[in-house]
Amino acid sequence: NFPSMLLETFDPPTGLYWEGEYNVDRPCIAIVGSRRSTLYGQNVARKFATELSRLGFCIVSGMARGIDTAAHQGALTAGGKTVAVLGCGLDIVYPPENLELSKHIASVGAVISEFPFGRRADRQNFPMRNRIVSGMCEAVVVVESNVAGGSMITARFAGEQGRLMMAVPGRIDQVSSAGCLLYTSDAADDLRGG
């Protein structure tokens, strides 16, 4: 049941722990973004996840506050499959307020981690988690991220892994949109040959 696309990456995990049914029989798309998201960003993530789920995609995210939570909720609202990739052991729910969300995800999809039981969430775990989020997906959609946000790390991994990378442009006066705006600006430069 190991995610086949993840095996194609340059640094796949040696193993995965999971809760629920990890039997994803459909293409996966990651929806990631800022923990300090705006209401607009949460609504966009929820809507994208709902619509993509209805089209048959499995939604993958990191179950963090903000955009990740909204993406999982959108998939669940549509009756779709969703996978949460944790930056801690399966026995630890992080953030704690997502306990019910974690249970719901495990009942219809899966909660997975490469970290052993007892491993707490810390800053160095999240970039490791992000390579799994992008690695098991065909595409990554970033909805709100500052320039140095973890979602931009996921975007970088997506590029290195040959995955399609998309960003939702946001308001130019929002710090939470700066990373997406930078990405869309760079992509536009590439299209213009700049």
Cite the ranges covered by each PLM segment.
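Glycine-biased, small-residue-rich flexible motifs in mid-sequence functional cores and linkers
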Residues: 1-185
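Single conserved hydrophobic/aromatic residue that forms the stacking wall/gate
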Residues: 183-194
